[in-house]
Amino acid sequence: MYKLCILFLVVIFAVMAIAKECIPSNQQCSTISPPCCSGNCVLQGKHFSICA
């Protein structure tokens, strides 16, 4: 039971880490941020970019 609980926590952390590797569409992004999940980082104005 103890090992199962540890395994479950490891899986959750792995999923969270993978989820943070990309930015959802319509969210702010930059050249140093993770890549967009779908599409590219598109400039909206001078200092504002969103994933499109």
UniProtKB/Swiss-Prot annotation:
<comment type="function">
    <text>This endoparasitoid wasp peptide has immununosuppressive, antimicrobial and insecticidal activities. Suppress cellular immunity which is detectable as a reduction of hemocyte encapsulation in the host. Shows potent antifungal activity against C.albicans (MIC~0.25 ug/ml). In vivo, ingestion of this peptide (probably at excessive doses) increases larval mortality and reduces leaf consumption of D.saccharalis, a permissive host for C.flavipes.</text>
</comment>
<dbReference type="GO" id="GO:0050832">
    <property type="term" value="P:defense response to fungus"/>
</dbReference>
<feature type="signal peptide">
    <location>
        <begin position="1"/>
        <end position="19"/>
    </location>
</feature>
<keyword id="KW-0964">Secreted</keyword>
<keyword id="KW-0295">Fungicide</keyword>
<keyword id="KW-0929">Antimicrobial</keyword>
<feature type="disulfide bond">
    <location>
        <begin position="36"/>
        <end position="51"/>
    </location>
</feature>
<keyword id="KW-1015">Disulfide bond</keyword>
<feature type="disulfide bond">
    <location>
        <begin position="29"/>
        <end position="41"/>
    </location>
</feature>
<protein>
    <recommendedName>
        <fullName>Teratocyte protein CftICK-I</fullName>
    </recommendedName>
</protein>
<keyword id="KW-0732">Signal</keyword>
<dbReference type="GO" id="GO:0005576">
    <property type="term" value="C:extracellular region"/>
</dbReference>
<dbReference type="GO" id="GO:0031640">
    <property type="term" value="P:killing of cells of another organism"/>
</dbReference>
<feature type="disulfide bond">
    <location>
        <begin position="22"/>
        <end position="37"/>
    </location>
</feature>
